[in-house]
Amino acid sequence: MRAAVVTKDHKVSIEDKKLRALKPGEALVQTEYCGVCHTDLHVKNADFGDVTGVTLGHEGIGKVIEVAEDVESLKIGDRVSIAWMFESCGRCEYCTTGRETLCRSVKNAGYTVDGAMAEQVIVTADYAVKVPEKLDPAAASSITCAGVTTYKAVKVSNVKPGQWLGVFGIGGLGNLALQYAKNVMGAKIVAFDINDDKLAFAKELGADAIINSKDVDPVAEVMKLTDNKGLDATVVTSVAKTPFNQAVDVVKAGARVVAVGLPVDKMNLDIPRLVLDGIEVVGSLVGTRQDLREAFEFAAENKVTPKVQLRKLEEINDIFEEMENGTITGRMVIKF
């Protein structure tokens, strides 16, 4: 079967891989779609360590074509996800308290185990979340990581209906954060980016205000918008350092800043302001299986609509180049 495999020179090669036989608790999935995430770019570039030889992909959707004898949670024909959180231990303090993504023994698709950019994938059956029948599978691929990640981040922000939430970076993650916050949580949205096309897209999605933080002072604009109060919360999906610092600058006292994007850099934090204004800066890592079920359902109800563009597996290196150049709006999705 064909698979997108990381090479030593930080490229991706389309190779023929042979799968082993299923072990107890596993299922075999015929891949239909796999979204391309910025985390895939980090993995390819060895930003998190060298994983030469691994098959990329953690936004996979496909149909079960075989199950191990002991599997009861899935059956042949089920449409399921192949997500970043491929498997956790199920026993540690994190797994037993609803925080399974923080498990220290977690396995991640397309990073520590082979992922979904392949014609077939072996999955741990209990971690393959079923996709609602009325949800388009290509759109579901984007929800499998980008969607659940931003849905969880918006939940972590604690934003309430009618409050102001700032979304920094209106790319594959940010456009979904905007939709979950606006259409599910009932928040008012300020979209921040340095690309006018992406900001226009944010406006189409229902953003209440858009700010090009390259052309204007985002703090001054927010203060005008909120009667000098600041935003109630921010979610940062950007992959550059500057927006993370700006996300702290634009919030009010008692606000929460949720970090989601993964720039290879460090934030500059004004510690006195954090302390004196009681500002919380927290990280949010993808989402649990339950978060993914909820994220799928909201998408199936048309409250969230991922913008996807179908591509071929052979275009994967071109997609990564476009990603590095910042020219992608929405999500590139490989069709198998």
UniProtKB/Swiss-Prot annotation:
Keywords: Metal-binding, NAD, Oxidoreductase, Zinc. SUPFAM superfamilies: GroES-like (SSF50129), NAD(P)-binding Rossmann-fold domains (SSF51735). It catalyses: a primary alcohol + NAD(+) = an aldehyde + NADH + H(+); a secondary alcohol + NAD(+) = a ketone + NADH + H(+). Zn(2+) 2 binds at residues 89, 92, 95, 103. It is an enzyme of class 1 (oxidoreductase). One of its GO terms (molecular function) is alcohol dehydrogenase (NAD+) activity. Binds 2 Zn(2+) ions per subunit. SMART domains: PKS_ER. Its EC number is 1.1.1.1. Its cofactor is Zn(2+). Belongs to the zinc-containing alcohol dehydrogenase family. This is Alcohol dehydrogenase. The gene is adh.
